[in-house]
Regions:
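Non-catalytic signal-transmission and effector/linker regions of two-component phosphorelay proteins
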Residues: 1-8, 112-137
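Active-site residues of response regulator receiver
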Residues: 13, 57
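Receiver (REC) domain active-site loop signature in two-component systems and cognate sites
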Residues: 60
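Alpha4 helix (beta4-alpha4-beta5 surface) of REC/receiver domains from two-component response regulators
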Residues: 67, 89-108, 114, 118
Length: 137
């Protein structure tokens, strides 16, 4: 029997207390977690390692979630299916338009544990059926 390889998750968010709480939850669930405080650092992390899931805040300094996703679409489209967005304002018209356009799942902050686990499970199931190509970020 092959050894169990833990799934890896990249959390991109600029709110330290939220990142700490989310990291603790994910690690308790058996995931290996790396964090980045903005989209630019998230892209750098993707150059170093592959991730099974990317949890990305929409509003951040330097490179926000929309710009991060646009970069993935151009340079690493196979990774787009692994993104789950986080936002404190999903009802804003610009956020609704973005979510409709990109077709990716999103979670409202603060997120329930059940919602986080459900979104991750759905992304992992879909990603299992598609190859992950290297990031040219």
């Amino acid at each position: 029997m092959a050894p169990h390889i833990p799934r890896s998750i990249l959390v991109i968010d600029d709110e330290p207390s939220f990142v700490r709480a989310l990291t603790r939850l994910l690690q308790r669930d058996g995931y290996v977690v790396e964090t980045a405080g903005n989209g630019r650092d998230g892209l750098a992390a993707l150059q170093r390692q592959r991730y099974d899931v990317i949890l990305c805040d929409l509003r951040m300094p330097e490179l926000d979630g929309r710009a991060f996703y646009a970069h993935l679409q151009q340079r690493a489209p196979s990774l787009c299916q692994r993104v789950i967005f986080l936002t404190g304002d999903s009802s804003a018209a610009d956020n609704q338009a973005f979510f409709a356009q990109c077709g990716r799942p999103w979670l409202d902050k603060p997120c329930s544990t059940a919602a986080i686990r459900r979104a991750i499970a759905q992304v992992l199931e879909r990603a299992r059926r598609a190859p992950q190509l290297p990031c040219k970020c």
